[in-house]
Amino acid sequence: MGEPSGEPPKQLNVLGLPIEQCCQDPVTGFFRDGHCHTGPMDHGLHPVCAQLTDAFLASSVSAGNDLVTPMPQYGFPGLKAGDRWCLCALRWHQAHEAGKAPRLYLRATHQKTLEIVPLNVLKQFALDLS
């Protein structure tokens, strides 16, 4: 066996492939690296790469999670419809049950999402599958 490279292991998407970038503008991800990477410190599990909608954002604000208002002190620009963002898997699932779930980029959605939402449900919202 070879020596460890010191690099973290490749994280995989829900399709079992290396995870692709979700968004750099605005920069997203729990680690603010543009990817929906996750790890032990991500207690809220933010692995879902979604294209936000007005309906989802309004629903999120009414549930107490304001993703719209800029918070410059945290480097958060505020989000708008059309932005891509790494969402909490449980929040996406709740939005799905309420009929407000945004569409997804499965190639940029971390495989940990499958612990909350089945792949057949995710595929119904995929923007990047032909």
Question: What are these regions, as identified by a protein language model?
Answer:
Residues 2-55, 127-128:
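Extended boundary segments
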Residues 46, 81, 102:
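Residues that flank catalytic or metal-binding motifs in active/ligand-binding sites
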Residues 51-66:
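Short, basic/aromatic beta-hairpin or loop at an interaction surface
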Residues 68-75:
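Short alpha-helix capping/helix-loop boundary micro-motifs
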Residues 92-115:
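Short, compositionally biased
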Residues 110-130:
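Glycine- and charge-enriched low-complexity intrinsically disordered segments
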